[in-house]
Amino acid sequence: MYPNLYYAFKDLFGIELSGLKLVNTFGFFVALCFIVSAWVLTLELKRKQQQGLLNFTEEKIVIGAPASFSELLINFLLGFIFGYKIIGAFTIADALNDPQRYILSSRGNLWIGLLMGLFFGGLKWYEKNKQKLANPEERTVRIWPQDRVSDILIYAAGFGFLGAKIFHNLENWGDFIKDPIGALISFSGLTFYGGLICAGAAIMLFARKIKLPIVHLVDAFAPVLMLGYAIGRIGCQISGDGDWGIVNNTRKPISWMPDWLWSYQYPHNVIGEGVPIPGCSGPYCNQLIQLVYPTALYEVIMCFIVFFILWSLRKKIKIPGRLFGIYLIFNGLERFAIESIRVNTHYESLPFKPTQAQIISIILFIAGIVLFVQSKKWVEKNKPNELVD
């Protein structure tokens, strides 16, 4: 396991760069997930635009105005945080020994933070001042759907993280009550379906606001969501963030299968779960007592397969909404299956004692079937470009 990129570079390339301790492996793959997803979503929105399914909207902007107070303040705050926390980490002796604790603490370098804040604010002022006109002009510009990708992903990231935390704490209410502040600010403890539901709701509201047809947007998102989830699960597997399966002491069904593909102890996992590894000193020196199913790895494999299926179908399916229905069906099946061997909280009072994810996966599966079957009827009642609601 590689808790952060420092250990990955040290093991794979023999390079020791202390600054890489600040880059959590799971966080790195989440960032990579958003970058790749943005690229693929842009490609799909452009394709739908060329098909005439999506159109531009017009907005008025002011050209030649000086930097506003809010712009200067935002850039100052970004620079201050960067200097205070990131650069400051290299000026504090023990900051990199426990990067996560340092990031969540109030420690940092005040003077470097102030200097970087002034520098970022100054850059914004200089940039706007170069473009300043004696009489600022108001112009009307065309905004295409692919130009909105960065805004869409900001909504996805913000509301996705919020939803993932809320659903996780609802599922683990006892742990939340014991330490509510720690549960809320911790980087661990995220529930995918919580993020999917909250981010999805926020993006659909944003799409309605900018008059972007939701039915075509969700179809564009179908392969993107599977691809992004697969990349994110790579981070779970490599960092050992606790997203593993139940104990697996059974024999491999196939003799040539690698041991780590059937059962694993997650040595050097990022959450420090298990018992000390003999001969290991320093942080991240624990491994699980018993072998468990590497469920995150299984999800990586399954979700990449589903992504390629959706990607191959996207040009063949002509009925709007049907591709997203297929995504919901696959999503529900995949998650329901993996939950049967995954460590999670079960609702003992319900029939077959499901997990929160299994309940939601059943709902998504049914919704996917309904959307797949009914989408043609809905399209016949509404012109494709009018399917905004």
Explain the meaning of each model-derived region.
Residues M1-D389:
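Hydrophobic, membrane-interfacing alpha helices
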